[in-house]
């Protein structure tokens, strides 16, 4: 399992590189990477386990964040409905956003990142809805439509695979500026 000491921090060149495509079938090393990326998220979202291991809670973790420049990320969006089901959970491999809404969305509290230790205030404008194509750990192709928070989480993780950090999207002169029609997500 990855610990906070394994998370690459802002300033490391791997976070600014274009990650390499992953080949199938997955090597044993890539299978273990996928398992470890998801395990971090599962453990970090359990308050007792999070405290026990000294983790920061996360909803996404990309391979470059653990020093591996490959197009792989885990996403575990916590349940928001009473049914207890996550709106999106998977290891996304070689993900591509194939369509996106014109409508922008942003988190009211801004975004954070396990690789960025400092608070970077400001709205991070993203597409409110996306259609995502990716492969899972078995090499099966998926195409899903996501909106609001799950869409934002996936865009954040995909940015990591292309050498972009969330604060690159923040307006440097007016970090809290936004279009009137931007959807603000709690």
From Swiss-Prot:
It comes from Levilactobacillus brevis (strain ATCC 367 / BCRC 12310 / CIP 105137 / JCM 1170 / LMG 11437 / NCIMB 947 / NCTC 947). This is Peptide deformylase. It catalyses: N-terminal N-formyl-L-methionyl-[peptide] + H2O = N-terminal L-methionyl-[peptide] + formate. It holds the Pfam family Pep_deformylase. PANTHER family: PEPTIDE DEFORMYLASE (PTHR10458), PEPTIDE DEFORMYLASE 2 (PTHR10458:SF8). Coiled coil: none annotated. Keywords: Hydrolase, Iron, Metal-binding, Protein biosynthesis. Binds 1 Fe(2+) ion. Fe cation binds at residues 113, 156, 160. HAMAP family: Pep_deformylase. InterPro entries: Peptide_deformylase, Peptide_deformylase_sf. Gene3D superfamilies: Peptide deformylase. The active site is at residue 157. Its cofactor is Fe(2+).
């Amino acid at each position: 399992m990855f610990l906070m000491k394994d998370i690459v921090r802002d300033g490391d060149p791997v976070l600014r590189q274009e990650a390499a495509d992953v080949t199938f079938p997955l090597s044993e090393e890539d299978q273990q990477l996928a398992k470890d990326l998801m395990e971090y998220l599962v453990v970090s979202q359990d308050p007792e386990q999070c405290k026990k291991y000294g983790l920061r809670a996360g909803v996404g973790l990309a391979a470059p964040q653990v020093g591996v420049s490959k197009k792989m990320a885990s996403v575990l969006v916590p349940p928001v409905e009473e049914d207890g089901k996550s709106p999106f959970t998977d290891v996304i491999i070689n993900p591509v956003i194939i369509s996106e809404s014109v409508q922008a969305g942003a988190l009211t509290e801004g975004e954070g990142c396990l690789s960025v230790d400092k608070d970077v205030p400001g709205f991070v404008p993203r597409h409110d809805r996306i259609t995502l194509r990716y492969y899972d750990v078995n090499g099966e192709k998926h195409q899903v439509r996501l909106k609001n928070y799950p869409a934002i989480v996936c865009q954040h993780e995909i940015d990591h695979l292309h050498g972009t950090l969330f604060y690159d999207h923040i307006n440097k002169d007016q970090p809290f500026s936004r279009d009137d029609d931007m959807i603000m997500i709690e």
